[in-house]
């Protein structure tokens, strides 16, 4: 009875409640909880039937580990969505604003396809494998009425997407003012877009700490995916056969520095803000 009162009291306050139990008298509270946990070794059949989860080893430390993994999975989903939406907003904004400003087509369809394959594939998947952050269990639990984009997540997504789009357009326009051909401008824009997104994937590793405070080698799968994506970009820009396919040209030193400069400017601005 006391367990049942505890469960109902916390649920009235909007909390998500987990209740453990093993005896027949625990079954109502286990059933009432958001997540009912029964003991697999000492638990009665009635309690097991009422439970959502059966703890096979009766070790409550296993329950703590499960909560940690659950928090990690939820956090990684938010990171994954944050990264992909920011990148897509940046790509759409690049094309849309370029047309409004009367520029030539900033990126060709085959180049956009390359961007999606390079930045939306392996890095995004590797980001979803990010290990739990050290302080993940010290954070307060989420409320049951808390939305997925809570904590200003949507604002950060839109803001970062806008910066990616503006930096790509800035790279395109700067190379154009330097007298570069349309192909050179597109190549610079392609480099800026891909590199800025590859930098952003490392920013998405944490919602609490900036890129400059994270261990860059904390997720080696992500490092490998980013390196492979960068290699694909370099091949598309430097290999003559691929230049024909992706309509790129080898940038000169000033064009390359311009493209990389606009790529680096975005995380610096975000880090300062």
Language-model-detected regions and their locations in the chain:
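Membrane-embedded transport module
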Residues: 1-19, 38-209
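Cytosolic catalytic headpiece
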Residues: 1-25, 31-35, 77, 99-102, ...
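Hydrophobic alpha-helical transmembrane segments of integral membrane proteins
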Residues: 105, 119, 236-237, 263-264
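Hydrophobic alpha-helical transmembrane segments in multi-pass integral membrane proteins
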Residues: 167-171, 228-244
């Amino acid at each position: 009875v006391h367990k049942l009162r505890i469960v109902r009291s916390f649920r009235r306050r909007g909390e998500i409640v987990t209740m453990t139990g093993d005896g027949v008298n625990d079954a109502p509270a286990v059933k009432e909880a958001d997540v009912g946990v029964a003991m697999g070794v000492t638990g009665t059949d009635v309690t097991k039937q009422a439970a959502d989860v059966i703890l096979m080893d009766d070790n409550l430390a296993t329950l703590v580990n499960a909560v940690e993994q659950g928090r990690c999975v939820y956090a990684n989903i938010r990171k994954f969505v944050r990264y992909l939406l920011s990148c897509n907003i940046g790509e759409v904004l690049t094309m849309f604003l370029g047309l409004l400003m009367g520029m030539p087509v900033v990126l060709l369809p085959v180049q956009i396809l390359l961007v999606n394959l390079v930045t939306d594939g392996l890095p995004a998947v590797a980001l979803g494998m990010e290990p739990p952050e050290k302080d993940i269990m010290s954070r307060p639990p989420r409320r049951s009425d808390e939305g997925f984009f809570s904590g200003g997540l949507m604002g950060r997504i839109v803001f970062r997407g806008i910066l990616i789009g503006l930096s790509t357009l800035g790279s395109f326009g700067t190379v154009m003012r330097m007298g570069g051909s349309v192909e050179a401008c597109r190549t610079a824009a392609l480099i800026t877009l891909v590199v800025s997104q590859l930098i952003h994937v490392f920013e998405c590793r944490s919602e609490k700490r900036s890129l400059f405070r994270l261990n860059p080698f904390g997720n080696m799968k992500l490092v490998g995916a980013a390196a492979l994506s960068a290699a694909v970009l370099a091949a598309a820009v430097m290999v003559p056969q691929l230049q024909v396919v992706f309509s790129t040209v080898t940038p000169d030193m000033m064009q390359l520095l311009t493209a990389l400069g606009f790529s680096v400017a975005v995380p610096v601005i975000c880090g300062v803000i």
